[in-house]
Amino acid sequence: MALSLAQNCVPSAFNPLVYGTEIKSLESHLVTNYSASVPEAYRYTSPSVELQNATFCNITVTYTHPGQNDSIVAEAWLPTEWNERFLAVGGGGWVAGRFFLSYNAMQGALADGYATITTDAGLGSSVEPSQWAQTSPGNVNLYNLQNLGSVSLNEQAIIGKSLIKSFYGQAPKYSYWNGCSQGGRQGLMLAQRYPTAFDGIAAGAPAINWNKLFTFIQWPQQVMNELGQWPFMCELDAITLAAVSACDELDGVIDGIVSDVKQCLGTFDPFSVVGESTTCAQLNGTRKIITSAAATVLNATWHGREDYHGILPGADLTGNSPRSFGQPGIAATDCTEKGCAGTPSNLGTSWLKLFVAKHATLDMAKLTREEFDSLAYSGTQQYASMIETSDADLRAFKAAGGKMVTFHGLADNIIPPGGTEDYYNAVADVDPEVREFYRYFEAPGLGHCFGGASGSPTGLLHQLRDWVENGTAPEKTPIKITVGNATHDRILCPYPQTSVFDQDCGDASKAGCWSCSGGVSVANRAKRSAQRWNEL
């Protein structure tokens, strides 16, 4: 079987036609003795795995939409030892796919026997969009943005299924999607706009409400610019640690994790630590007094803009603390003994400058609040239908038999979890039987897609597959958390339920001492924060 499949790995064996496209080139070659170590961090919903001596057909399809001057590359890996299933993977940040995170996910898929595919949406692998955002100064390349937003995703599914049928002589029995962040947004877009593309979708920390999200990512920097003060990162880190210390035991267990983020957001006052001192790495280890400006920036970031949620207490905001785990901070500053300047994320600045204002040299540091708010509104006006993925009507996905699971870390330091909660609630408003096809898991302590005191929900993809193929919906999912130097077993529960520790059981390190509590209806739910930040 493997030998005959290997003989099929020639360009002439494939003809992946997609209506409205034209194939520019198709290359294939057989890869043998391929091995890789894949960490769980890059798989999101599956455990770490060792890929050993795999043999697969690597197929690269380059195509265009005639008249649009684009060039999209889809890359598929078809293993000779196949489980008769298809797993497509997503991208991250500004990248649709075909970069290191996608390739790690594909390596993991191969190890589990899946045929797998990724696409670059015609954008290449650059982590920032300046190379493709505009056709000329002031003119956005709407075709490229459309390809990133939606079009290439459906084509990725069609091409993948066509290649699979040509190679194996049969279509996949089941098709799945797995992604986080940009990949999570892509998963939601597939469920909303292409409801028959995949049987099961795992969409972690999705970048829903794209314009509001990317505007919010710039929000802490805007607050600092308006204040005319850019706090030392050690000040923000110290307030974050104070919040963790104050809110840790709200769930009845002291473990360094803020689980009851809503109560923490409503009760902990960041201004309560103003005037205290903290050791500051940006000042070569000397002490720094925590300023009111630092508390103001952090408070604004926690509560979010008037129309959008904020990052929650416990999440790293600087990328400089032990809680960052190498992830960037949206409230980062660059400091010397003379003072600090803001260091904004290119996610927010690139979006607002290149796409919304269409002005690559716009000085973001000089925007007034009125100008900033105007940009935010304009972005939604221009691009909501193209990339937002906020459509809550998933009835076509449900009717097609689709199942979806979403997770979001409550210590996510880039994408506010409140947006994912709001989306699930909105879906429930359209279809009160949402649990029949869609479940959402909040993960206390988990950072953006991975990292943090909590591990990733590594059983979720297997549970999704069991739901699709056997009708067994996930009632909980296992995770591991780090407490000091020890690893504890816990569970996550489908929203709106939460995991609760049984004090009589006595051992918080055992998953059996935790259970899901609360009703399953999202009716009469409380908003995550009653406050939105309107004034400095």
Enumerate the predicted regions with their spans.
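Catalytic-loop region of hydrolases
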Residues: 1-85, 97, 103-104, 257, ...
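Secondary-structure transition/capping motifs at alpha-helix termini
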Residues: 80-83, 112, 165-173, 194-200, ...
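Cap/lid segment of the alpha/beta-hydrolase catalytic domain
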Residues: 92-169, 215, 364-379, 384-386, ...
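Gly/Ala-rich beta-loop-alpha elbow adjacent to hydrolase catalytic centers
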Residues: 178-183, 187, 412
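A catalytic-pocket lid/entrance helix-loop region that shapes and gates access to the active site
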Residues: 189-191, 196-306
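Short beta-strand/loop motif that positions the catalytic acidic residue
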Residues: 405-408
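Conserved alpha/beta-hydrolase "acid-adjacent" motif
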Residues: 414-418
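Histidine-bearing beta->alpha loop at or near hydrolase active sites
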Residues: 438-451, 483-485
